[in-house]
Amino acid sequence: MKFRTLAVALGISAAALLAIPGSGATASLQTGTERMQTGPNQVANRYLKQQLVWKQCGDPEYRTFCAKITAPRDWSNQYSGNDIELAVSKVTPVGKSKTKPSRVIFGNPGGPGGAGLGMAPYLASQAALAKDHLFIGFDPRGTGDSANVTCEGAPGFTMDARDRDSSNLDLISEAALLTRPYCERQSRGLLPFVNTAQTVQDIDLIRQLLGYDKIDWVGYSGGTWLGAYYQTYFPAHVGRFVLDSNTDFTKPWSDTFLAQPQAFERRFREDFAPWAAKHDDKLGLGGSPRLVIRTYERLRRELKKQPAVEEFLDGSVKISYDQNALDDIIAGDMYTKADFQSLAIDLAFLRDLSAAQTKGGPKAAQRKVDALPLARQHELVRRATRSTVGLRPLGRPFADDAEDATFTAVTCNDTPWPQGREYGDQLAARLGPKYPLLGWGMNENPCFYWDRPALEMPVPTGKGLPTTLMVQSVHDPATSLSLATSAHHRYAGSRLLTITGEGDHGVYGGVNKCADKIINTFLTTGVAPAKDLSCKGEGIPAPSVPDSEDDGAGAPLRRIAGFTKEVSGYLQ
């Protein structure tokens, strides 16, 4: 993204959105009358005396061991008897099984709500770090193998966000309004305590149980928010922190999400569409960016008029492709250029599937699916059921309910949001015409109706901290460059490493050799760049023939998700 503040990028700011010009609409900013304690709490001895029992999780090749720790449900009320369990993973450097590594590095993949046990083997796979770090991953409270929250049964957003009919807007509003009651009723009292203030204290408990004075950190996406707040709550225990693909952690969550419609639209129109047009001879979506976008819009209209509901794998899986599914597929594939080829192939398939259905009816479309090789059917099922990696857009659910519920709890609990339906509808009406991929769905947000806990967290400033290294690609769709530059200017002592000509969300670990070298130097030596730096992007690769299933190479967050899948479920 060109260097522009959020106010310029969207023509609007979080403060200005409280009164949208020309609409007559106003929205109150949500506040609490009684405040939860905002600083860290002294830890009760019973939590510090617990012994961690490590067991191997996953195949031996991952060298990963996992344990459960006990933490209070509410850190400001440690003697209530209401405890929760948290899942932690570790990988010890080769040759250090009997000696304590000199440093410990924690990782978080973001979400917020992403399970993170896979961060330990992922970080251990970075050769530059492998000598003398203990690698730690964890599932934050609410998700993964830790104590879960759930919103199961909540209606969700199945409507077409572009439909501005009053009855459709009623349905969107009612779905958003009903989300919290479902979450609260089924989460057994945990929901208000799934927030960043509680989670950073969980992290520091892990630090103390491991016996380290300071931690290093690699946080992606929502993990930049969590990392900055850990620094704010526990500055004396901060080591070398890398914040990759940045939220604006110096402002409320709303600022970060308000930047997404433009950033996703830019990634789609300025990165994917020109790339697809350049390779039209192989992909067949149109010979110009305008024609590629036209292919998408035409397909969206057809799938709205007549969704394609197909059976895969001999009827064992049924997938419904409608306009929302199409938008979700596109948004999900904007996070990494490694998914561009799969997206192009899927768009061509859906175009042909829809055409077959229009011409010959549902049976003709099903015959087209049945003719696909089993490997291709498996790939379509995998892509249809995957979770978003990185900071997801509003209204787009994770495949996993606990991740989805944790995302909602953290983003709605942490910081105030403007309240009320009128605000959300006016926001969507303003952003939708400019940024149709996501803008119309900006009213699909439970936070506009959320009864927050009385929580007020200190604003991260960076003052008194060691250097923080912030890393950002310029066309990141989920966390816009505008957010990184805004936070960087407000975060004392930070350095910003920008990757130009790049749009991947999540950089460290294979996206850019220049960036990896700078980050590894910082993490292994503590030597930070003396000034802000930039690296040149390595470009979007041409389509390969034939398309091979993506193994996550060059896409760090996909690799982390793969590791997490392999090492989870062993602590039940």
Describe each model-derived feature in a short phrase:
Residues F3-G11, I20-N168, V218, R290-R294, ...:
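Catalytic-loop region of hydrolases
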Residues T26, R294-L465, P541, A555-Q572:
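Alpha/beta-hydrolase fold active-site neighborhood
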Residues Y182-G189, V200-K214:
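Conserved acidic catalytic loop of the alpha/beta-hydrolase fold
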Residues G464, L469-Q472:
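Short beta-strand/loop motif that positions the catalytic acidic residue
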Residues P477-S482:
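Conserved alpha/beta-hydrolase "acid-adjacent" motif
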Residues T500-V507:
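Histidine-bearing beta->alpha loop at or near hydrolase active sites
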